[in-house]
Amino acid sequence: LEAWMKKSILATGAVLVLGMGIGADALAQVKPDVLVAQRQAAMKLQGKYLGPIGAMMKGAAPYNADVVALNATFLENLARMPWDGFVPSTSGEKSKTKPDAFKDAAKFRAAADLLEAETAKLGAAARAKNEAGVRAAFGGVAKACGSCHDAYREKS
């Protein structure tokens, strides 16, 4: 490579590394109430997109593969969103999160990983227009949601 190209690549890399560090610092400075609001919004949106699929699975609405595929795609993305909002600085904020979510972060993260994996299965089945696969995967998503809420969410 030309010398100027090497310098350009190194400079770009340095900017990216510095930018990543600034991004991490910025997240660490987000106010706890904002993090709680972010995770609550992500959970509410998951419910919004899961609800119509659930209605179809129960027979309360006709099965629509296009709606399932769209909603499952949203769910795949939303399933990854709330977790960076569950940090120790938010433990004193008003929310339904049980203290165990912060005391055993590895176990809590495993529950989050399970939800992400199950929504990925749902998304794959939905994009393949595989109704039987969607039904099976929906059960996995519902179970992952329920078990995490049972363990880490206060009852209303």
Model region roles, listed by residue range:
Residues 1-4, 156:
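Signal peptide-directed secreted proteins
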Residues 3-13:
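Bacterial N-terminal signal peptides that target proteins for export
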Residues 4, 22-28:
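Sec/Tat signal peptide C-region and signal peptidase I cleavage site
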Residues 12-21:
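Bacterial N-terminal signal peptides
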Residues 33-67, 71-156:
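Sequence context surrounding c-type heme c attachment/ligation sites in exported
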